[in-house]
Design a protein with these regions (language model features):
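C-terminal motif of bacterial Sec signal peptides marking the signal peptidase cleavage site
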Residues: 12-15
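Post-signal-peptide N-terminal segment of Sec-exported extracytoplasmic proteins
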Residues: 25, 32-75
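Structural motif
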Residues: 116-118, 138
Length: 171
């Protein structure tokens, strides 16, 4: 029995062995240089400037939408979700958190705030922890947890002016 098993294994091993030469691999084509009249990679289209009046209009149209922690649609917004949603309606991706949004765009001085700029406040911890969208040099729209709805407020109000951190202009 052992001998039969040994013969069977030897027959299988020799049956699987290669009986001829290994064929040569297919030749690989050499890379061609790019055609002189075609660009090697397409150039992305230039970004169009942000439509600031449309940003403000969208933000104002959402007044009265409820506050919802973690919310990012008209059924409920938190502050950064509100900003991300408004900018997305204009085809511009914005990060989802206040700290990431604060890292976007160019810093703008408090006297140069313009409609569509992001305004940041320190309401919970040191540094930016709340964000809104400027609708003029002295007003902004945001989703505060205190009132429960998206609303317009004055940047000069003592609560907001004492907590103002900075402004970012999104190109």
């Amino acid at each position: 029995m052992r001998r039969a098993l040994l013969l069977l294994l030897m027959a299988l091993a020799t049956g699987c062995a290669s009986g001829g030469a290994v064929p040569a691999p297919f030749p690989t084509p050499s890379p061609r240089p790019p055609s002189p009249d075609l660009p090697s990679s397409p150039e992305p289209p230039p970004l169009s400037p942000l439509d600031r009046p449309a940003v403000v209009g969208t933000a104002l149209s959402l007044q009265g939408a409820p506050y919802r922690n973690g919310g990012s649609d008209p059924s409920g917004f938190d502050c950064s979700g509100f900003v991300a949603y408004v900018f997305a309606q204009q085809g511009l991706y914005m990060p989802r958190t206040v700290s990431e949004q604060y890292a976007q765009g160019q810093p703008v001085g408090p006297d140069a705030v313009a409609p569509g700029d992001l305004v940041f406040f320190s309401t919970v911890a040191p540094g930016a922890s709340h964000v809104g969208i400027a609708i003029s040099q002295d007003q902004f729209v945001h989703a505060p947890s205190s009132s429960g709805v998206v609303r317009v407020e004055s940047l000069a109000a003592s609560y907001w002016s004492s907590r103002f951190v900075g402004t970012r202009r999104i190109p």
